[in-house]
């Protein structure tokens, strides 16, 4: 197996592939965060003991 100079150790991904993967991870984190903020707001609004 020849070493590919474009692959980055230890993942074996190229820089472009790793940047694309990172973009998807960050997008997923933002979506999760937005859902969590909405869920916490709804829990605050509909929980009488939090007022």
Curated annotation (Swiss-Prot):
Compartments reported by the entry: Cell inner membrane
Main localisation: membrane
GO biological process: photosynthesis, light reaction
InterPro entries xref list: Antenna_a/b, Antenna_beta_CS, Antenna_beta_dom_sf, LHB-1/5, Light-harvesting_complex
Cytoplasmic side: 2-23
GO annotation, cellular component aspect: plasma membrane; plasma membrane light-harvesting complex
Record's keyword annotation contains Translocase: no
Domain of life: Bacteria
Membrane topology category: Single-pass type II membrane protein
Presence of the UniProt keyword Transmembrane helix in the record: yes
Positions contributing to a bacteriochlorophyll binding: 22, 40
Annotated family: Belongs to the antenna complex beta subunit family.
Record protein name field: Light-harvesting protein B-800-850 beta chain B
Organism: Rhodopseudomonas palustris (strain ATCC BAA-98 / CGA009)
Name of the encoding gene: pucBB
């Amino acid at each position: 197996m020849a070493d590919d100079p474009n692959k980055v150790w230890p993942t074996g991904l190229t820089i472009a592939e790793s940047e694309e993967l990172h973009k998807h991870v960050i997008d997923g984190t933002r979506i999760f965060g937005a859902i969590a903020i909405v869920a916490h707001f709804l829990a605050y609004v509909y929980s009488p003991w939090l007022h």
